[in-house]
């Protein structure tokens, strides 16, 4: 941004240039994306010529070059030259370098840096026999109660996987890498040793540094140096939840952590240019999972949206899982003039999903409250957790994890509570690592290639997730999938199931969700169950057909199950047996009836959502739902 001197001239990076009346010569930061195959040197020369044709004394000053996830530049130039830059041969798009913030936390309890508070959840965390057969279960059971309760909710206390040999990247505000939480030695062979870490730093063309076995690569993309020390507590808390190795244990305690600091040390803003630089490097660093607990309002800039969507797609194609916070924006009606904090029933679009959570390639994570009084199955979704769907009607979020009242590491050696989808997301980043560890090491999946093994991780996580019953509704109705996605992650199920679902014709076969679009006459979709074991598996089918309740002209955030009471859901069979080493397809038909149609017509003149779940309840011992 430009500063104005006392003489009325603009000062940009210490240089002075004549001010124009319309401000078009003001120098701004922008991102320029080039078309595939464009010669970058020739394109930059043409860009400079285009700028000079309008502002003879100006040029395009390049601060970054992108070469891996996309081709382009971060540069500074007069704002009035942007259209000319867009017109240069080989330029795909050009847009202002926006700033993002880390996802704002939800309503936090008072910080508890002393390490007190929280109930002991160990009564639900397994027997002595479990601990003897699974030493990791014993280690998890010895944790602080607030950490254990969140992990018991996800049944992470039942798993033996630790993320050994896996790498997660934390794109955030930086991490206190000297924190005792990260000081323990890793079990297993690390994916990145000091030699490979040095090689990777050379490959990405920056001076990123190998800090330790736990932190094989760290770089400050916002300020352009090796000091990835935190700007605030956020990144350290997130990293701890994903992969702490101390007694305050993360989901994947043996995973290595790449630290990509993208927030400025002053102000904490995250420039697009820094975020894109980190993402561009991920294509070379190739972590198994990337955590992005950050976001902004969706749909602010179509050129930026198109570029980011392409970058996320490119990383997914490379077998990198992107776990992203859904946002903490409640519902669309929160804070409106009604005083009810509820959306008007005149508009069914109550989505508040932000970017990048709205993009198709990412795994968008919703938040549920940590059951601090013991993980007993009676849970509550976090009010602040944003509702889907995406602007183009894709079903989001994908999955839920504990994000309300999460206890984890903060800079300076302490621990404290934080709340937000930012805190739920690293639970899933750790989950992606441990489930991938299972898939890569389990002979049952040996016939899959490397990319298929990455993809099946999300089939397993979403396929074994447990839909959360809404305690505010009664009658056993679930929260809408627009609030919770597939449900609460069940890591015991995801690390033991030998059957996984796919939805036929889905845009992404690794995401078992049926996105059926608009309509009033009904829908059909098919689900295929794939069995990789030598044992047949039998399931009984059930469903809920949910629609949000309407009271006094407002959507309430709670849903009624209309199945059999205004909506018909039928299956091609009430039970299904999946043969050993085989697959079986089940057809599902959904038909709204007159009773439901009349209710919608009377209460939601612009229409409403009909969503829900199809459940496959296992009737085979040892096989999870």
Language-model features and meaning:
Residues 501-512, 533-601:
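Surface-exposed binding patches on compact interaction domains or structured appendages
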Residues 380-385, 491-537, 600, 607:
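Beta-sheet-dominated interaction scaffolds and their linkers
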Residues 7, 49-167, 181-184, 188:
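Autoinhibitory propeptides
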Residues 239-241, 260-264, 288, 400-476, ...:
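Hydrolase catalytic cores
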Residues 39-43, 164, 178, 245, ...:
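Substrate-binding/access-modulating region of protease and related hydrolase catalytic domains
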Residues 205-220, 351-433:
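Extracellular S/T/G-rich loop segment that most often corresponds to the catalytic His/Ser-adjacent loop
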Residues 26-27, 162-164, 270, 276-277, ...:
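Short, solvent-exposed loop/turn segments enriched in Ser/Thr/Gly
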Residues 157-271, 285-288, 316-319, 332, ...:
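Subtilisin-like serine protease catalytic core
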């Amino acid at each position: 941004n430009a500063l104005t001197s006392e003489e009325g001239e603009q000062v940009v990076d210490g240089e002075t240039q004549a001010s124009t009346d319309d401000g078009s010569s003001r120098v701004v930061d922008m991102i320029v994306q080039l078309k595939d195959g464009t010669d970058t040197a020739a394109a930059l020369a043409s860009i400079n010529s285009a700028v000079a044709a309008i502002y003879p004394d100006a040029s395009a000053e390049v601060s970054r070059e992108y070469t891996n996830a996309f081709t382009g530049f971060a540069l500074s130039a007069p704002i009035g030259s942007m259209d000319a830059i867009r017109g240069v041969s080989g330029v795909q798009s050009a847009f202002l370098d926006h700033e993002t913030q880390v996802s704002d936390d939800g309503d936090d309890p008072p910080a508890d840096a002393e390490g007190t508070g929280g109930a002991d959840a160990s009564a639900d965390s397994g027997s002595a026999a479990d601990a003897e057969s699974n030493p990791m279960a014993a280690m998890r059971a010895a944790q602080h109660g607030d950490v254990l309760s969140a992990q018991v909710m996800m049944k992470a206390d039942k798993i033996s996987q630790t993320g050994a040999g896996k790498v997660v990247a934390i794109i955030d505000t930086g991490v206190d890498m000297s924190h005792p939480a990260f000081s323990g030695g890793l079990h297993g062979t690390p994916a990145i040793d000091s030699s490979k870490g040095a090689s990777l730093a050379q490959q990405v063309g920056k001076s990123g540094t190998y800090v330790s076995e736990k932190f094989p690569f760290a770089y400050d993309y916002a300020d352009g140096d090796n000091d990835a020390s935190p700007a605030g507590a956020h990144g350290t808390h997130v990293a701890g939840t994903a992969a702490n190795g101390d007694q305050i244990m993360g989901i994947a305690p043996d995973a290595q952590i790449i630290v990509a600091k993208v927030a400025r040390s002053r102000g904490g803003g995250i420039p697009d240019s820094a975020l894109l630089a980190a993402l561009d490097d991920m294509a070379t660093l190739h972590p198994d999972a990337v955590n992005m607990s950050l976001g902004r309002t969706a749909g602010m800039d179509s050129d930026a949206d198109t570029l980011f969507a392409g970058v996320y797609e490119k990383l997914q194609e490379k077998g990198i899982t992107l776990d992203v916070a859904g946002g903490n924006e409640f519902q669309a009606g929160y804070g409106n003039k009604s005083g009810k904090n509820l959306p008007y029933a005149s508009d069914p679009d109550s989505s508040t999903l932000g970017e990048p959570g709205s993009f198709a390639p990412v795994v968008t994570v919703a938040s549920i409250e940590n059951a601090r009084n013991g993980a007993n199955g009676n849970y509550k979704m976090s009010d602040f957790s944003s509702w889907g769907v995406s602007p183009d009607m894709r079903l989001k979020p994908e999955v839920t994890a504990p994000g309300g009242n999460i206890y984890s590491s903060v800079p300076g050696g302490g621990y404290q509570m934080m709340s937000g989808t930012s805190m739920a997301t690293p639970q899933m980043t750790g989950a992606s690592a441990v489930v991938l560890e299972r898939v890569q090491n389990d002979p049952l999946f040996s016939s899959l290639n490397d990319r298929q093994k990455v993809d099946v991780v999300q089939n397993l996580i979403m396929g074994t997730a447990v839909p959360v019953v809404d305690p505010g509704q009664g009658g056993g109705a679930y929260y809408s999938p627009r609030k919770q996605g597939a449900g609460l992650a069940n890591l015991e199920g995801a690390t033991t199931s030998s059957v996984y679902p796919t939805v036929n014709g889905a845009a992404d076969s690794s995401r078992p969700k049926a996105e059926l679009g608009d309509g009033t006459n009904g829908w059909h979709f098919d689900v295929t169950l794939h069995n990789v074991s030598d044992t047949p598996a039998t399931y009984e089918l059930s469903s809920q057909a949910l629609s949000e309740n309407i009271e006094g002209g407002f959507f309430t955030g709670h849903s009624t199950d209309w199945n059999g009471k205004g909506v018909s859901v039928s299956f091609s069979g009430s039970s299904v047996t999946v043969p050993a080493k085989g697959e079986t397809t089940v057809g599902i038909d959904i038909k709204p009836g007159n009773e439901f149609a009349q209710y919608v017509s009377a209460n939601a003149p612009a229409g409403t959502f009909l969503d829900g779940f199809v459940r496959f309840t296992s009737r085979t011992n040892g096989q999870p739902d």
